Structures are given as structure tokens and as C-alpha cells.
Amino acid sequence: MMSRLNSVVIKLWLTIILIVTTVLILLSIALITFMQYYFTQETENAIREDARRISSLVEQSHNKEEAIKYSQTLIENPGGLMIINNKHRQSTASLSNIKKQMLNEVVNNDHFDDVFDKGKSVTRNVTIKEKGSSQTYILLGYPTKAQKNSHSKYSGVFIYKDLKSIEDTNNAITIITIITAVIFLTITTVFAFFLSSRITKPLRRLRDQATRVSEGDYSYKPSVTTKDEIGQLSQAFNQMSTEIEEHVDALSTSKNIRDSLINSMVEGVLGINESRQIILSNKMANDIMDNIDEDAKAFLLRQIEDTFKSKQTEMRDLEMNTRFFVVTTSYIDKIEQGGKSGVVVTVRDMTNEHNLDQMKKDFIANVSHELRTPISLLQGYTESIVDGIVTEPDEIKESLAIVLDESKRLNRLVNELLNVARMDAEGLSVNKEVQPIAALLDKMKIKYRQQADDLGLNMTFNYCKKRVWSYDMDRMDQVLTNLIDNASRYTKPGDEIAITCDENESEDILYIKDTGTGIAPEHLQQVFDRFYKVDAARTRGKQGTGLGLFICKMIIEEHGGSIDVKSELGKGTTFIIKLPKPE
């Protein structure tokens, strides 16, 4: 109910009705009052005119009694006529009840003295009681000299008339006026409602449009064709709606781009407001925050508080377990609506970079050592032969064998470095051919038969000789050579090394499994990284460069396949190679 009363249509309609009703009431009151006054004045003027004529008739008549009787015949019923010579000496014996009361009014009302003494016309309303009811009459006294008396200058012609006819006329006029006002008010009500609805229709359309705009719907644009202020308001609102839509679209696009950029960042991003609440975060930040410990959280909170105090950019390193982060906090003047400030936290995972840097350092140290050792041996044994220190043929032969072995070792190290450099510069190319896998595995069997016997290892090859794979013979030879060499380093006499073939619907699978020392879990994710070495697990043979498994991974991926490792410390390691089947 209250919502309807608050409607502009109802308010405008009620306003029009109130104004029209007020005007009609005032006009009706004025009209009724005027008509009452008009008819009363007309009646009074008519009575006065009758009194003047009777006075003139009686004055000019020779037979005054006949003139009076004639006048009474004309005036009486419904009115009455009295001609009084002396108000103080009148007989009431032959008068009717009404005339007696009229005469009593004339005698007792001092206003009528002006008729006899001053010759003025006097009019009064007189209430007469007759037969238990009251009736109002108009009584007019008019001076005349038709019958002089010794007590007064003038005689008086008194005419009275019943006002009931005037009251009936006034009542009829009042009823007609009220009925007319009601009819006019009814018509005005309907017209006012129609007019207010018509006038406010554009406003209601604008209200609906404003509601839709507040809900995010900018497609509704009502057409208001009027040339008045409402039409101008509609045009301005439509233009404003279009501009708002454009701005919202621009903001949405900007927000989507910003969110996409933030979510695609490799750094974790957090937005912190003055209440120290997170108002913005990307997936990387969520992952980091879910996995950090309480000490790291305390570290972040301290840095955030320091940034709020200094209002400067802070950059600090955070080490947590085996991971390394760089935390950057920047103060922002306005990060929320209302001009509230905050801090943007950027957490970058530098673990890979740190490990890579560490591996480079280790690589330089290892390569320096690996190069220095064979070079020192080459120099030492050759100097011994040249200087004649070693003269026995068997000793010379043994020294030359050591020189040859160290030369091969140095050559292998240099080749690995050159291969990696060539891969970085030119990329890796493979020439795949559809050929039996047995050709590769037979080659490996022959190559490592003697080495397995020397090391006391049980090396087995299980494969289907008729099965064909799509691979590059030379590249896969390089891969298996590296993996079998590594397996021999991880094992001890009596352990097993098994090379097994398998397949699924889309891939050919090769397993290289050993029962050696295994690899610790913290190293598994990094064994294929460049320069990475698990030195603690190496128990036999010469030191490597940390590039072998990295090269293996590049070769397998260039084949369109994948290489993975599973290991359990103390129980052994399995490398799994998957290559796409020939088309």
C-alpha cells in the first residue's frame, strides 16, 4: 500500500484531485452563498417595490379603505399586508395569529421606529411559531403619508413574506451544485488519472531503465519522443547509459586482461589492504601460501608491516626447506575504493634458478676437476716416459694404457660439452626410421657383455625380436649407453640390470631397471636437469659431468616421447622410455 502511495502517478493524481476538489468546494460555497444572497435581495427588492406601490396607491386614492383592501387581496397569500398608523395604539382583535406576531414584532422591535419617525425603510427576518413549528418570514416596513397620526410623522406599510420558497430554491440550487461538482470531480478524477499516467509513463520507463542499468543490463533503451524536459532527460539518460556501458566494458576488459596477466604470471601475487586482508591473489600465490610453514608466514607478515611503515618497496630472500623465494612488497596509495592504501606482495619461486646457479658452480668445479685429473695424468705419465724414469717395457705399456684411458675420458667429457653447446645453438635433430628394436638391444648386449662380467653384474635383455619401433639408431644408442653406464655406477657385484620391452595402445615402452643403491626422493625431480649430479649415489667408476641424463631427455623428447624415473633408496632405480608407435 505504501509503495503505491509513493508512486508518482498516484501522487500527481491525488494532487490534481486535491486541487480540483478544493476549487470545486470554494466555487460551490461561493455560488450557493451568492444565490442565497441574490434571491434574498431580489425578494426584498420586490417587497419594497410592492410597498412603494401600495403606499403611492393609498396616498393617491380617494377611498383609502378600498385601496387597502385591494392591496391586501394582491399581497396576501402567501404573504401579508399591514398598514399601521400608530405602533403604540393598535387593536389585535381581528388579526390572524401570524399578523398578531408580526404586529408584536413591529411594536417591540426598536428598529421599526425609524419607519415612523425617520421615514426609513426597515427589513428584518422574523421567526413565527405556528402549530408547533417555526417558520421564517421577511418583514419589511415602508414609510408612507397615506394616513397621518398625531403621534408620528409617518404611517407604515408592512409587508411580510414566507422565506420557505427562497429556502427551497436555495436547497435546490445547493443540490444541483453539489451534484454538478460530484460529476465534474468524477470526470476530473478519471481524466487526472489518465493524464498523470500519460505524463509519468516516460518517467516509469526511465525508472525501469535505471533499474536494469543498476542490474547490469544496458540493452533496454526506451524511446521517448516528446520534445519536453522528460524527452531531453530520456535522451541524456540513454547517452549516459551508453557511456556507462562502454566504461563498464572497458573496465571489464581491463580487469579480465589484468586477471589473465596476474594468473599467468610465474610469480605469486597478493594484494593486502589496510586491515591486512588478502583482496587479490593468483593461483601461484595460493599454491605458495598453502605450502609455506608458520615461520615463512611470520617472515611475510614482518615484511608487510615494514612496508606499511616505510611506504617503500622491500625486497628480501626467503628460504624454506629446499625452496628459495624472492619476496617483493610495494606500498600502494589506493588499493581499494575510498582511497584505502595497501601492499602488493610478489613472491617469485627462484628454486630452479638457485639450483641452476648452484649446478653451474658445481659443474665448473667438477669440469675443472675432471679436466685437471686426466691432463695431470697425461702429463705425468708422458713425462715419466720421456724423461726415462719408466724404462721397462711392461711399465711403459702400463703407462701408455693409462694415458689412453685418460685420453678417452677427456674426449668423452669434451664431446658431452660440445653436444650440449651444439644442442643449445642449433637444436637437436633425429632421423627416425622404422626398424626392429632388436637391432639396438643386440648392439647394447654385445657392447656391455664384457663390462657386466668384469663388474660381476647380472645383465639381461628381454624383448621381441620381430617388433619394430620408430627411432634414430645413433641417438637411441647414445641414450641407452648413458643409462646403462649410470646403472653400472649405481650397482655393486651381484646386482641385476634388466632391459625390457613393452607396449600399450599408442606407445612402445622400454624399461632400464637396476637393483642398485637407488636415488633419494629429493633428487628425483632434478635428475634430468642440466649439470645435476647425484654424487652421493655414485659408488663406482669415473665421475660424470651431470649432462648425460639431460641429453637423454632432449633426445627422447625430440622423438616425440617421454622419459621418467622411479626409484626407491636402497632398492634400485627404473628408467621408463616411451616412444610413439610407427604410423
From Swiss-Prot:
| Name of the featured protein | Sensor protein SrrB
**Domain (HAMP) ranges:** 197-249
Give the bilayer topology.
Answer: Multi-pass membrane protein
Top-level taxon of the source organism: Bacteria
Q: From the UniProt record, which GO molecular function terms apply?
A: ATP binding; phosphorelay response regulator activity; phosphorelay sensor kinase activity; protein kinase activator activity
Q: Which residues carry this modification: Phosphohistidine?
A: 369
Q: Does the keyword Transcription regulation apply?
A: no
Annotated SMART domains: HAMP, HATPase_c, HisKA
Q: Does the keyword Acyltransferase apply?
A: no
Q: Which residues form the Histidine kinase domain?
A: 366-583
Family matches, as SUPFAM superfamilies: ATPase domain of HSP90 chaperone/DNA topoisomerase II/histidine kinase (SSF55874), HAMP domain-like (SSF158472), Homodimeric domain of signal transducing histidine kinase (SSF47384)
Please report what switches on or represses expression of this protein: Activated by SrrA. Expression is maximal during the postexponential phase of growth, particularly under microaerobic conditions.
Transmembrane stretches in the record are: 12-32, 175-195
EC class (word): transferase
Catalysed reaction, written as an equation:
ATP + protein L-histidine = ADP + protein N-phospho-L-histidine
Q: What does this protein do?
A: Member of the two-component regulatory system SrrA/SrrB, which is involved in the global regulation of staphylococcal virulence factors in response to environmental oxygen levels as well as biofilm formation. Also plays an essential role in host-derived nitric oxide resistance by regulating hmp/flavohemoglobin, an enzyme that detoxifies nitric oxide by converting it to nitrate. Functions as a sensor protein kinase which is autophosphorylated at a histidine residue and transfers its phosphate group to SrrA.
Name where it's found.
Cell membrane
Segments on the Cytoplasmic face: 1-11, 196-583
User: Source species, please?
Assistant: Staphylococcus aureus
* Taxonomic lineage of the native organism: Bacteria, Bacillati, Bacillota, Bacilli, Bacillales
Which keywords label this protein?
ATP-binding, Cell membrane, Kinase, Membrane, Nucleotide-binding, Phosphoprotein, Transferase, Transmembrane, Transmembrane helix, Two-component regulatory system
State any GO BP term from the record: osmosensory signaling via phosphorelay pathway
